[in-house]
Amino acid sequence: TASIFPNQMNLLSSDKWCEVATHPVSGQKRITSTGKVLNNARKIVFISTGESKAQMVRNIAVEAKPEYPASHIQPANGELIWLLDKDSAQLI
């Protein structure tokens, strides 16, 4: 799994396979795969549900805004799959 937050973009370029990430609001510690691992995966799946996620999905999937870590996940030789409900997909 991945928990790379905008305030920890350095985790995208880490040479380690996994790192400790800290949620920017709750401070919760999480183990995350790094960008290097994610971009070398055979298959990456982004899952999103709910209307509250619609703008974020658009920002990442359509506009590829660089301030969002998920915009940097582009598997080199793999497949990127989006699983969305109609509410989270309404702006794409």
Q: What would you call each of these model-derived segments?
A:
Residues T1-I92:
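Conserved phosphate- and dinucleotide-binding cores of soluble alpha/beta proteins
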